[in-house]
C-alpha cells in the first residue's frame, strides 16, 4: 500500500509534528499494469462502497471507427506507442492514450483499463 499523505519533513529538513496519525483514506494502491493476454479482471471496493474493475490482462478491445460509426470487438496484437512511459511499449503495458496495433489497424485507447476494466479504442489512420 502507498501512503499519499503529507510529508513529515519540511523543505529545510526540519520535522512537522503531526496532530494525528495516518488514515486509511490516504492510502493509494499499486497500478493495474494491464498487459496483453487472456482477459483477467479484479474488482475492488472503493470509497462509499462503490466498486472499480481493474483489467489486469486484456485480449480484446472495443474499437470504434469514426467514419462508419461502428464499434467492433477486435483482438489486440501489440502496443505500438505509449506517451506515459517509453518502457511500457517494451512491456506491452496499456494505459489511456496508448496506441495499440489491432486486426483493423492502429487504434488509440480512450478508456482507463485500470479503472474501467475494459479497453475502448478509436481507430486512427
UniProtKB/Swiss-Prot annotation:
Subunit structure and binding partners: Part of the 30S ribosomal subunit.
Organism: Methanocorpusculum labreanum (strain ATCC 43576 / DSM 4855 / Z)
Keywords: Ribonucleoprotein, Ribosomal protein
One of the GO BP terms on file: translation
Superkingdom of this protein's organism: Archaea
CDD domains cross-referenced by the UniProt entry: Ribosomal_S8e
Molecular-function GO term, any one: structural constituent of ribosome
Family to which this protein belongs: Belongs to the eukaryotic ribosomal protein eS8 family.
Cellular component terms per the entry's GO annotation: ribonucleoprotein complex; ribosome
Name the record gives this protein: Small ribosomal subunit protein eS8
Amino acid at each position: 500500500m502507498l501512503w499519499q499523505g503529507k510529508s513529515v519533513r519540511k523543505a529545510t529538513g526540519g520535522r512537522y509534528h503531526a496532530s494525528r496519525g495516518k488514515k486509511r483514506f490516504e492510502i493509494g494502491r499499486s497500478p493495474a499494469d494491464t498487459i496483453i493476454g487472456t482477459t483477467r479482471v479484479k474488482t475492488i471496493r472503493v470509497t462509499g462502497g462503490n466498486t472499480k474493475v481493474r483489467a489486469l490482462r486484456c485480449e480484446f478491445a472495443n474499437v470504434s471507427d469514426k467514419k462508419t460509426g461502428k464499434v467492433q470487438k477486435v483482438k489486440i496484437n501489440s502496443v505500438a506507442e505509449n506517451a506515459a512511459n517509453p518502457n511500457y511499449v517494451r512491456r506491452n503495458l496499456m494505459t489511456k492514450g496508448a496506441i495499440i496495433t489491432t486486426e483493423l489497424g492502429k487504434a488509440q485507447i480512450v478508456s482507463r483499463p485500470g479503472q474501467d476494466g475494459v479497453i475502448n479504442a478509436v481507430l486512427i489512420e
